[in-house]
């Protein structure tokens, strides 16, 4: 999974913590 601030997609489990911010395109 991806860490905070990492570029991400809209996949729910793409980020280790929290979810992907669709506006910034980064993990929150």
UniProtKB/Swiss-Prot annotation:
GO cellular component terms given for this protein: extracellular region; host cell presynaptic membrane
Main subcellular localisation: secreted
Record-level Gene Ontology MF annotations: calcium channel regulator activity; ion channel inhibitor activity; toxin activity
Disulfide feature: 1-16, 8-20, 15-27
Note: Found in injectable (milked) (IV) venom.
Domain remark from Swiss-Prot or TrEMBL: The presence of a 'disulfide through disulfide knot' structurally defines this protein as a knottin. The cysteine framework is VI/VII (C-C-CC-C-C).
Protein name: Omega-conotoxin-like CnVIIH
Species per Swiss-Prot/TrEMBL record: Conus consors
């Amino acid at each position: 999974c991806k860490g905070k601030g990492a570029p991400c997609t809209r996949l729910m489990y793409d980020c280790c913590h929290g979810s992907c911010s669709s506006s910034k395109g980064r993990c929150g």
